[in-house]
């Protein structure tokens, strides 16, 4: 599973030019191995991590056929947020924001209008201190939809693939395509080995995440639920979908119409519509995931749990260690298991990845 993302990216470009749709691990009826060797299964976690112990105890309980808390494999559903839960969001901001900035200011094939450039400048000025306007989550995705409108799905995948080859701002020895949390990839592998069906439920663009996880996170593409833009046939024009007849010569393209921003209660609605089973495990890191957590642990017919990551590592990442206790108290008070990136993980991105302590963000997008 742990193939190098860069190899996958290069092979994708050279051999196919598109991102393929793979199949994930399927549930089986094989007996569950109850003994976990932390040194090999969770080599990126500290062995004394209480959060890890709680996760292992939970899984061993609900996969034991003799336990009163046994959950049949068909109902073992785990949902994961993406940004800040499986991949970096502090270099210096969301990776999707960085890609949109590149599209607006550094892509010669795209001519941003004045309103788009103004939005880009706003992102530039607020990214460093995370002081985005309160409606930023939605307005970002609506501008993202506009910036990539007209691209076919393959063209968009290729664009994302090329962007992911760029060096991650604020780090040495890491490209954006490798900016994922190694300990959390181990969690997905572990759960799938115990017949859990893992879903990524993210506020990021669904197709962006499909490309990002290729060769990194072994989750089937159909198990990715994200923010969506409307698609249409390239030559469809103003004809409604229920009228237009798709032909073998047609190509699907992205439009500038945002269908859904998949955060907060939208995540709950999407889970109900697309999975049709309530999760028994939920993993997130922010207020945007609280609704998904509450949906998981409230009125569930099975034993359930929610895990909330805390970005408190200011040595290996750009977290805020001073807020660690405050956030732990907050999340545990809501019934979630708190995971400290600082104290629970041996590494975040790998020992060779080094935090530089500075960003090129402002100089990259300085006024001309």
Question: What spans do the regions from the language model cover?
Answer:
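Non-catalytic pre-domain segments flanking phosphatase-related domains
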Residues: 5-82, 90-91, 97, 104-110
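C-terminal cap/substrate-recognition subdomain and adjoining C-terminal extension
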Residues: 27-45, 60, 68, 158-368
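Short, structured coil/loop segments at alpha-helix boundaries
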Residues: 48-53, 68, 93, 110-124, ...
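Electropositive phosphate-/nucleotide-binding environments in soluble metabolic enzymes
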Residues: 49, 150, 265
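Short amphipathic alpha-helical patches
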Residues: 81-83, 106-110, 123, 214-215, ...
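A metal-dependent, Asp-based hydrolase signature
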Residues: 91-92, 97-177
